[in-house]
């Protein structure tokens, strides 16, 4: 009869480590203390982003780098905006914008009587248009001395005044055709008087050497039709 040795272990011995240990055991992560039977080939692992930094300065970890809790008063506002963006997202916000348009070529404080459009057309100012309209109400045609005097007063050229009156007469005839006047005797007399005065002014303008463009020729034909 055999007796168990008093110093024999009560449990079965632990299994021997494998011949080819893997780097996933706890011993491999914490560092092996015992010797292995064969050479172990180290397996390259990618360190974490902060592992090298924290391993170099373990003694400089002070509470200043730790996150501080938000004040209770401010925490309620932080919960209202959970998706806050960092400042880096807006670092190049201005660069992404398209460049501004063309710079200002004129100052609004500079008084310019004339503004040219495309095609050589002239844009008259409000004061010039008002004075020209007043003159047109009393006189549809201008003699050369009157045109010269009006151009000098409005700081325009005679050609500009003449062109404005040509366009204004064309508009006046068009409106008159769209809205013909009544056949009353008084209105007919007034129309005849205005027509005769316009014809006289036109005759003076032709005698003084005014231009004979197509628009002015239409005015002459209209006057002949009225006098027939």
Swiss-Prot record:
It is found in: Nucleus. Residues 184-207 have a biased composition (Basic and acidic residues). One of its GO terms (cellular component) is nucleus. Its main location: nucleus. Expressed in embryonic endothelial and blood lineages. From late-blastula stage, expression is restricted to the dorsal marginal region of the extraembryonic yolk syncytial layer (YSL). By the onset of gastrulation, expressed in the entire dorsal half of the YSL. Post-gastrulation, expression appears in both anterior and posterior lateral plate mesoderm by the 3-somite stage. Posteriorly, expression is in the intermediate cell mass (ICM), which contains both endothelial and blood precursors. The keyword Nucleus applies. InterPro entries: HD (IPR001356), HD_metazoa (IPR020479), Homeobox_CS (IPR017970), Homeobox_DNA-bind_prot (IPR051000), Homeodomain-like_sf (IPR009057). The keyword Transcription applies. GO terms for biological process: anterior/posterior pattern specification; cell differentiation; determination of left/right symmetry; digestive tract development; dorsal/ventral pattern formation; embryonic hemopoiesis; exocrine pancreas development; heart development. Residues 117-176 bind DNA. Residues 175-228 are annotated as: Disordered. One of its GO terms (molecular function) is DNA-binding transcription factor activity, RNA polymerase II-specific. Induction: By dhama/boz downstream of canonical wnt-signaling. SUPFAM superfamilies: Homeodomain-like. Coiled coil: none annotated. Residues 213-222 have a biased composition (Acidic residues). Keywords: Developmental protein, DNA-binding, Homeobox, Nucleus, Repressor, Transcription, Transcription regulation. Recognizes the DNA sequence 5'-ATTAA-3'. Transcriptional repressor. Regulates the differentiation of both endothelial and blood cells. Plays a role in embryonic dorsoventral patterning by regulating bmp expression. May establish anterior identity. Functions in the embryo to regulate liver development. Functions extraembryonically to generate organ chirality. This is Hematopoietically-expressed homeobox protein hhex. It comes from Danio rerio.
